[in-house]
Amino acid sequence: MSRKKKSRKPGAAGAPEFMVTRNRSESDVAGRLRKKDKKRKGLKAGGRNSEEGAQQKHGSSQVRDPRLGSKKKIPLIVEPAKKLTKQERRLSAEQELEMLENDAKLNVLLDRIESGENLGRGLQQYVDEKLDRIEQLMSQLGLLEPEAEEEFEDEAPVRKSRSDDDLLADFEDFDMDDYKG
């Protein structure tokens, strides 16, 4: 009698296990399937591209790239640029003036100037540009009151034009000794 090898399975020592009997065709089919699976152990060729395609199919209903396939109609005839009317320009000037008057940075810098602080060259230039633009917009909109220059002219003494002889006489009469220390 031939010798049987000992099995390490726990149930092998006591009761014999039931043997599954298959006919030859079933075992052939099972063997072929195992062999086929062994051949295809690795990843599919071109798997990188096919996986992205599968992910796009699942996510296409949720996330869509807005750059692809725009449905916006494009005009084939170029229309000339519409010029702004005076009223529209005035509105835009009013809006710009409002924006400049509410400029937080400019207000802070003006407060610093009023408190006697000296600003740097760049900040002072910024303030000057903005104030000039405000003045220009106010004059454009007719909000700027004309300065009273006539009053200053009346207060200033009017100099008479002097002749060359008068100037020469003043020069000759001038005494340098009065200014020596």
Curated annotation (Swiss-Prot):
Annotated Basic and acidic residues bias: 156-165
Biased composition (Acidic residues): 146-155, 166-181
Domain of life: Bacteria
Bias (Basic residues) ranges: 32-43
Record GO terms (molecular function): GTPase activator activity
Keyword Cytoplasm: no
Keywords from the named record: GTPase activation, Ribosome biogenesis
Pfam family, one: YihI
Positions of region (Disordered): 1-75, 145-181
Gene Ontology biological process terms in this record: ribosome biogenesis
Positions of transmembrane segments: none
Disulphide bond pairs: none
InterPro entries to which the protein is assigned, alphabetical: YihI (IPR007336)
Function summary: A GTPase-activating protein (GAP) that modifies Der/EngA GTPase function. May play a role in ribosome biogenesis.
Subunit details: Interacts with Der.
Homology family: Belongs to the YihI family.
Entry protein name: Der GTPase-activating protein YihI
Species, as recorded: Vibrio vulnificus (strain YJ016)
